[in-house]
Amino acid sequence: MNKKTFYLTTPIYYVNDIPHIGHSYTTIAADALARYKRIQHFDVFFLTGTDEHGQKIQKAAQACNKTPIEFVNSVVKKFNTLWNKLNISQDDFIRTTSEHHCLRVKKLFQQLYEKGDIYLGEYEGRYCVPCESFWLESQLEQDKCPECKRTTEKVKEKNYFFRLSKYQKRLLDFYHQHPNFVQPESRKNEILQRIKSPIEDISISRSAVEWGIPVPMDPTHTIYVWIDALLNYITALGNDEDTRKFQKYWPADVHIIGKEILWFHGVIWPAVLMSLKIDLPRKIFAHGWWTVEGKKISKSLGNAIDPLAIIQTYGVDAYRYFLLREVPFGLDGNFSYPALVHRINADLGNDLGNLLQRTLTMIEKYFQGTIPVVVDSEDELRSLSQDTHDKIAGEMEELQFSRALENIWEFIGHANKYIEEKKPWTLAKSSAATPQLIRVLGTLARALQDISVFIYPFMPITTEKIQRQLGLLESNSSLHLEFQQNFREGTVIRKENPLFPRIEKESVLTERVVSE
């Protein structure tokens, strides 16, 4: 039987500088969803990558006395290093400088031109180099970019334009017919208001930028970086040559993006697909920003956070957990090291870590390290575990990672409460209570096994550590990711150091800028 497919993407990240917390947030969220869908037996295709053309990169390379390709190669290595450290499980990493992407973009651009949706005109207005965005004078205050607040440049040049205005009604109709196309609801309402306002055709080429894909019918122009970038979602599937892969996975089930690029994904991208007569993605989820003291995190503001420094100090899974637990996905969140340390000490150390440590200590003390086996009818936490499993499914469907984790920690709380109520240390004092002691510790072991499956999408390393200590993993065996499995008779625990040792206040990092 063929598995049901699930195609999800992050944006491809602009490589004018090294990756920061915002890049890692989007990618960790996508990775958690990909891992969850895999253990639900979906055939997952998870795409991420890098956006490597444009004026900003051309200027950044010049400032470093490098060619553009030398510059982007050096930055792409840093993205790959961070993704490896974060245990990102992407199925493909696309680069817009790759030959196959460039060839496919040219073909698609040519198709848009032949359909009459691209024409040569003259653009006169303002352009933001850092955001690679065109703006009308009427959209600006004091010539400042509405997104990054930097001063825009006055531009007047011949450009090729895409007939975006032609698709205004079709876009509105599509949004009304697909009310869940953009999530969360507040973002959808914002973008709908913009679509209802007059929409102008957009410039999709540059004549003064050399670093880009040449326009196929006019090599004196290069294709605007945002059109080049958006097309990655279909070029990665080999839309022209390997049509089987494209037919298998498209349309994408979800594009996970930051809210600042919703116009491109929620308006321009659907219109381009409509022109190409390609189905639109099923969902776009635009999450919020991380802030420090209420300001968006960015290197230019001097408040960027270095993910590698956090990982080195606090661990990968603690970082992944914090980002996905601290803030409901879709809202803005404020980052602070004290908040991170509190989550580690309270949630990971006290709640989860102590549950594992106490359970294993009692199994070691009362059963010589062999996990007592219980049957379902004796397992008093099993129905709560099933409820948790079902709640997680609902939250993950809505990309509500924080609420999914809240449900997991509620179950962890039930397991800790179960220890206090059953008092296994008291049961151990009477041989007559041995059957009860077997039931209690066997129930706790099975609860921990279920917890290890629940947390896997968010904290895969911790899942491995728990399952190894529960005696489930041989030297080369794979993780046990099926829900509510029974222990084999004679399974012996392998107690190790605490999962998350307590962090003292004096070891807390201060806010630090991304390292050069």
For the regions a language model picked out, list residue spans one by one.
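Residue-level recognition of alpha-helical structural elements
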Residues: P68, P184-R187, L348, V374-L381, ...
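Basic, alpha-helical terminal appendages of large translation-related enzymes
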Residues: M1-T5, F45, G49, G121-R126, ...
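N-terminal, positively charged nucleic-acid-binding surface of large information/translation enzymes
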Residues: N2-N180
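Amphipathic alpha-helix face/heptad-repeat signature
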Residues: I344, L348-D351, L355, S377, ...
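Active-site-proximal binding-pocket segments
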Residues: L262, L323-E326, G330, A339, ...
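A non-catalytic, amphipathic alpha-helix used as a structural packing/dimerization or gating element
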Residues: A32, E70-T81, D351-R358, D387, ...
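Structured secondary-structure scaffolds
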Residues: M1-T48, H100-R104, V155-K365, E406-I408
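Short, glycine- and charge-enriched coil/turn segments that flank and shape catalytic ligand pockets
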Residues: N2, Q142-D143, Q177-P179, D218, ...
